[in-house]
């Protein structure tokens, strides 16, 4: 059985006792809000199913005194959740897509890429600097960010500022900003602030010419067991075609560059007039060196889902059998082409030096 037939079968089975779908999530407030939103959508689609949310801490949640890029481990926010999937303790896991590596461990796949919210970064200012911008902050002001990508781009753009690592969940980082006198501002993902209902704290949105965003930023990904056809069918309806195609291009670019948390890589994508545009860049740690370019490809964004073959291999960790294959392959090839272009221009040297310097500090 293909398509939503399996999902319908799940919804009908076990009556009168309803089948319970167990959903894994990180414990942070933002992770819970994100998971609740996905579960609410699934409940509306499948009123015959019950959902149980199981929250757990991950390595990235526990190690709070070290910059993410220094911990030296991929899957910082996903490993414990994947163990639960593997042991059949949960049926699906909701993540921020940017936390999911472009190569997933064997046996797992991203079964849904949900509609993207704002992918841009935002600046939140200390109360005494409200009304300022990064440009107008005093000389030597300290700006907190946990991301090499943000720090590299912003040091290049705003050399009068100093950038320092700040860790913790959103609540913790905002508290550190407001209560300590250490930071004049911090950089956070706009989507996270919006989901928490903290739009009023956004003092400045950073547009691509100031700071391109992380691969997958603003989108949620639903990770499942790769061979669990029932659950794949269940969550597949959550795929947002435009978000999916943009994120396949972004993840393909990152994967082909062999980038990750330990190097500054950023992107910007857009679909306009039947064209998918991908801008990607790499930076040295201090932002002094950079290499960027833009490419485009013709793409057809499907209006509705359709059933596809069950044996199609994953693309950059994503399974989307209900979205036509051709545009997915076009998006993947665009990412590969742009990465190849930058590598041929010498991007590997910038990334290698950034990686070595990051590991040495």
UniProtKB/Swiss-Prot annotation:
Signal peptide: none
Pathway: Porphyrin-containing compound metabolism; protoporphyrin-IX biosynthesis; coproporphyrinogen-III from 5-aminolevulinate: step 2/4
Protein location: Cytoplasm, Cytosol
Xref: SUPFAM superfamilies: Periplasmic binding protein-like II, Porphobilinogen deaminase (hydroxymethylbilane synthase), C-terminal domain
Annotated EC: 2.5.1.61
Free-text cofactor note: Binds 1 dipyrromethane group covalently.
InterPro entries tied to this protein: HemC, Porphobilin_deaminase_cofac_BS, Porphobilin_deaminase_N, Porphobilinogen_deaminase_C, Porphobilinogen_deaminase_C_sf
Swiss-Prot/TrEMBL cofactor(s): dipyrromethane
Superkingdom classification of source: Eukaryota
GO CC terms, sorted: cytoplasm; cytosol
Biological-process GO terms, alphabetical: heme A biosynthetic process; heme B biosynthetic process; heme biosynthetic process; heme O biosynthetic process; protoporphyrinogen IX biosynthetic process
Sites of Phosphoserine modification: 69, 147
Modified residues (N-acetylserine): 2
Oligomer status and interactors: Monomer.
Protein role: As part of the heme biosynthetic pathway, catalyzes the sequential polymerization of four molecules of porphobilinogen to form hydroxymethylbilane, also known as preuroporphyrinogen. Catalysis begins with the assembly of the dipyrromethane cofactor by the apoenzyme from two molecules of porphobilinogen or from preuroporphyrinogen. The covalently linked cofactor acts as a primer, around which the tetrapyrrole product is assembled. In the last step of catalysis, the product, preuroporphyrinogen, is released, leaving the cofactor bound to the holodeaminase intact.
Family of the protein in this entry: Belongs to the HMBS family.
Protein name: Porphobilinogen deaminase
Lineage: Eukaryota, Metazoa, Chordata, Craniata, Vertebrata
Gene that this polypeptide is encoded by: HMBS
């Amino acid at each position: 059985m293909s398509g939503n037939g399996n999902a319908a079968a799940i919804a009908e089975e076990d009556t009168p006792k309803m089948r319970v779908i167990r959903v894994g999530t990180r414990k942070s407030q933002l992770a819970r809000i994100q998971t609740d939103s996905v579960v609410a959508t699934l409940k509306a689609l499948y009123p015959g199913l019950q959902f149980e949310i199981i929250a757990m801490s991950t390595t990235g949640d526990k190690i709070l005194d070290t910059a993410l890029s220094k911990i030296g481990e991929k899957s910082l926010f996903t490993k414990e959740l994947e163990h639960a999937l593997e042991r059949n303790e949960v049926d699906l896991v909701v993540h921020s897509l940017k936390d999911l590596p472009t190569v997933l461990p064997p046996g797992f796949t991203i079964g849904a890429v949900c509609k993207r919210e704002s992918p841009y970064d935002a600046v939140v200012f200390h109360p005494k600097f409200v009304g300022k911008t990064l440009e107008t902050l005093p000389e030597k002001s300290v700006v907190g960010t946990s991301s090499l990508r943000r720090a590299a781009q912003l040091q290049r753009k705003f050399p009068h500022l100093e950038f320092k690592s700040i860790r913790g969940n959103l609540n913790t980082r905002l508290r550190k900003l407001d209560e300590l006198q250490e930071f004049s501002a911090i950089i956070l993902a706009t989507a996270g602030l919006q989901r928490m209902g903290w739009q009023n704290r956004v003092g400045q949105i950073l547009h691509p010419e100031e700071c391109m965003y992380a691969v997958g930023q603003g989108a949620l990904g639903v990770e499942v067991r790769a061979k669990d056809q029932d659950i794949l069918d269940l969550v597949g309806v959550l795929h947002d075609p435009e978000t999916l195609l943009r994120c396949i291009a972004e993840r393909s670019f990152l994967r082909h560059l062999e980038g990750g948390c330990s190097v500054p890589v950023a992107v910007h994508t857009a679909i306009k007039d039947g064209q998918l545009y991908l801008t990607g860049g790499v930076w040295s740690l201090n932002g002094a060196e950079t290499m960027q370019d833009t490419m485009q490809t013709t793409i057809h964004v499907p209006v509705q889902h359709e059933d596809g073959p069950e044996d199609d291999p994953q693309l950059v960790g994503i399974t989307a059998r209900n979205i036509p294959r051709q545009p997915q392959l076009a998006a993947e090839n665009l990412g590969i082409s742009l990465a190849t272009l930058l590598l041929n221009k010498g991007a590997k040297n910038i990334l290698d030096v950034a990686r070595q310097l990051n590991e040495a500090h």
